[in-house]
Amino acid sequence: MQLLKQLFKKKFVKEEHDKKTGQEGMTLLEVIIVLGIMGVVSAGVVTLAQRAIDSQIMTKAAQSLNSIQVALTQTYRGLGNYPATADATAASKLTSGLVSLGKISSDEAKNPFNGTNMNIFSFPRNAAANKAFAISVDGLTQAQCKTLITSVGDMFPYIAIKAGGAVALADLGDFENSAAAAETGVGVIKSIAPASKNLDLTNITHVEKLCKGTAPFGVAFGNS
């Protein structure tokens, strides 16, 4: 912007000189330079604004996932089971139920990437039904999938990725027995199962394969 101001200042001085000498107007080269600088500045502003928006969305996602996780464990862990969720409709009702109980706000229930409520599934742990839960964040681009997992993955002991659609109960397996295979880039990539090959960002293969496939992606973050 400072360079742009200097150019206009020089142009003003030149115009004053031109008036005295009978010459007027900006050269074509000067016009091209000014327009080029304006284009670069505008592109930079747009890029910075988009990065700021993306950062805010990721922060919101992390806060919402943490709030939901805390609400679920405080409300249901002592009861021994989480409410059964046979499908996405039931999973959506579990989310709405936490809102109606005042455990989370309606804003915390929303997926910040698409504005709809996140689904909460209950699934087995060591073959016992409804002993674990998974919060699904759907409708992600590949870039959003990767950034979300690397941003909030440490908050959860279980992570599963679905490529080409939303997470369903059948994608979750067993919290304790479904081994992770992070080298595949999809499916269960983090688990407490003994044979798990959990996501390791120091493993270049894991980094390259993460969120492999076609968007939209869904990511399930689980705990028990």
UniProtKB/Swiss-Prot annotation:
Record-annotated disulphide pairs: C145-C211
Propeptide: 1-25
Membrane topology: Single-pass membrane protein
Keyword entries, A-Z: Disulfide bond, Fimbrium, Membrane, Methylation, Transmembrane, Transmembrane helix
Residue ranges crossing the lipid bilayer per the database entry: 26-46
One Gene Ontology CC term in the entry: pilus
Pfam families: N_methyl, TcpA
Cellular compartment(s): Fimbrium; Membrane
Modified residues (N-methylmethionine): M26
InterPro entries associated with the record: N_methyl_site (IPR012902), Pilin-like (IPR045584), TcpA (IPR010271)
Entry remark concerning the domains of this protein: The leader sequence region and some other sequence particularities suggest that TcpA may represent a novel class of pilin, and imply the existence of a novel signal peptidase.
Function per UniProt: Major component of the toxin co-regulated pilus (tcp) which is a type IV pilus essential for bacterial aggregation and subsequent colonization in the host small intestine.
Name recorded for this polypeptide: Toxin coregulated pilin
Organism, scientific name: Vibrio cholerae
Taxon lineage: Bacteria, Pseudomonadati, Pseudomonadota, Gammaproteobacteria, Vibrionales
